[in-house]
Amino acid sequence: MFSLSSTVQPQVTVPLSHLINAFHSPKNISVSVNTSASPKQHRDTVAEHEAPSSEPVLNLRDLGLSELKIGQIDKLVENLLPGFYKDKRVSSCWHTSHISAQSFFENKYGHLDMFSTLRSSSLYRQHPKTLQSICSDLQNFPVFIQSRGFKTLKSRTRRLQSTSERLAEAQNIAPSFVKGFLLRDRGTDLESLDKLMKTKNIPEAHQDAFKTGFAEGFLKAQALTQKTNDSLRRTRLILFVLLLFGIYGLLKNPFLSVRFRTTTGLDSAVDPVQMKNVTFEHVKGVEEAKQELQEVVEFLKNPQKFTVLGGKLPKGILLVGPPGTGKTLLARAVAGEADVPFYYASGSEFDEMFVGVGASRIRNLFREAKANAPCVIFIDELDSVGGKRIEFPMHPYSRQTIIQLLAEMDGFKPNEGVIIIGATNFPEALDNALIRPGRFDMQVTVPRPDVKGRTEILKWYLNKIKFDKSVDPEIIARGTVGFSGAELENLVNQAALKAAVDGKEMVTMKELEFSKDKILMGPERRSVEIDNKNKTITAYHESGHAIIAYYTKDAMPINKATIMPRGPTLGHVSLLPENDRWNEIRAQLLAQMDVSMGGRVAEELIFGTDHITTGASSDFDNATKIAKRMVTKFGMSEKLGVMTYSDTGKLSPETQSAIEQEIRILLRESYERAKHILKTHAKEHKNLAEALLTYETLDAKEIQIVLEGKKLEVR
């Protein structure tokens, strides 16, 4: 028993045990209040176990001490029971705390580390790095705050609530693209049906009807959703099937499969092409070659006609000729006439960097062809794959491709019904085993077209454009000696482009002549500004060529002379033969040399030896080539006789010296003949040069008028 005095209440006498029980009651109430008030203590919850007590519980109200504050009770208890809390805290070896301190040292010992305090002072302070500052800012984000506690049912409930609260707080600091990731598993809070009816104040009499309507609407919505899902599923299935059919169609298309189809290993995809739109009617100017290939077409159409008599058609046909004469077009026409599959391959497509790729592609090509026999295999630029085999240690595997080609064409296994057509510009470079009978045992020459062939080709291409009725293809054909079919096609196309640029509705002879001059002499360069001195030198230089060509008996006729810069030259004189030349006589070769010398001779006679130019370099090259061929190839030297000297590097020094001496004699004699002609016709030379300075370009008729001493009409 003890007495307690206070200014507020009169003196009251209570037992000590009652006072202690009353003291514990408000302490527990205050702790629970403080725990619910602090959000941090929500995260650090500890399981509370309350043991049942049989003793009656007294509170301050029963004792008449309800007006005392908790702080006053703590102070009174500490004064009455000194060392109560201190002894209780010291008796335990652990310091329990629900909230973590700033450091592990403070959590363990209960006070700060002096060394850490000094280090955090201004004397030891360092500027934080960028990455360190970012990490320190991130650790304060709610999403990174750790939550520790015992895994009890109550703590689990509170942890789930705190997690949802942190996610809600994270929405304000997280970027927009992270919010969906953070909240992807958060479901929508659904309100129960009973709670909804209570909120809407629906009477109990109408609640059954409300539930029935809600159920019917839910079932209808489910049916509609199921129908929509089924429709989407069917649509996706249809699109997938269409995609598969599209890919299959691309792979089977003969024109697109080469690009889109891939094969296993290193073999390339091989697909035939039907040439139904190309026949022999499209081939002009090579009548003899077409007749040779008619036998192949007949065999492909009617093979029994030949097998009954015991005859066999050639397995391979070799087309030989200069570029642009129509070798590829002939091969396509053969396949088109016979209406059989056509396999095209270039000689450079077989070999690559990997060993054995060429032979593998040859096998693949012939395997596909045999499966689709009868058919035609056309190998363009055959010399690229079928060249002569030589001993070369750097590439010992380069001969595998040609050996495989030889075996496929005439090996142990026959290839009935497969016709191989090869095309090359250099038949002398092919291997001898490739062109023997049984492989390429038929050789067809495809030459440049003659006047008749050029006329047919020009008519064929002119019918594809709009041209004037005054256009005469024979005149253009006579002026395009040596042109191939491809060059004639280019001539007509250039004329059509010129007419379109000039705004004309159809092509006339003027555009065709312009196109011919552009091909023979090069395009005009009208923007080049040449001073009068160089223009005068060019006029006399070109006039010298024209005078020699006009007054030399066996020289080719003049087609046109111009001092307009064309291509790399400042002027040009075009010469064209009247008819096709199948052979050239010695006098014609000497005349060509004389015409080449005319430019330099004119410069020397008019301006002196100190003012000759470098413009005659190409003329000297042409004259030297003609003289060298006359001596070493044509046997036109009296001293060396009828003997050819193909490899001058293997000749003796005396023979080489004799060849050079003969070439030098021919060139000197040609130079003297040109000088004699220009001295004899000095007046005509001057008149022609002045006419070129006035008109810049003169054709054959205008040159003849000037040399006859007549005046030209004003243009």
Curated annotation (Swiss-Prot):
Localization of this protein: Mitochondrion inner membrane; Mitochondrion
Keywords: ATP-binding, Hydrolase, Membrane, Metal-binding, Metalloprotease, Mitochondrion, Mitochondrion inner membrane, Nucleotide-binding, Protease, Transmembrane, Transmembrane helix, Zinc
PROSITE patterns: AAA
Mod. after translation: Proteolytically processed by mitochondrial processing peptidase (MPP) to generate the mature form. Degraded in an OMA1-dependent manner in response to oxidative stress.
GO molecular function: ATP binding; ATP hydrolysis activity; ATP-dependent peptidase activity; metal ion binding; metalloendopeptidase activity
Ligand binding (ATP): V283, T325, G326, K327, T328, L329
Main location as per UniProt: mitochondrion
Catalyzed chemical reaction(s): ATP + H2O = ADP + phosphate + H(+)
Function, as annotated: ATP-dependent metalloprotease that catalyzes the degradation of folded and unfolded proteins with a suitable degron sequence in the mitochondrial intermembrane region. Plays an important role in regulating mitochondrial morphology and function by cleaving OPA1 at position S2, giving rise to a form of OPA1 that promotes maintenance of normal mitochondrial structure and mitochondrial protein metabolism.
Assembly description: Homohexamer; may also form heterohexamers. Exists in several complexes of 600-1100 kDa. Interacts with AFG1L.
The name this protein goes by in its record: ATP-dependent zinc metalloprotease YME1L1
Species lineage: Eukaryota, Metazoa, Chordata, Craniata, Vertebrata
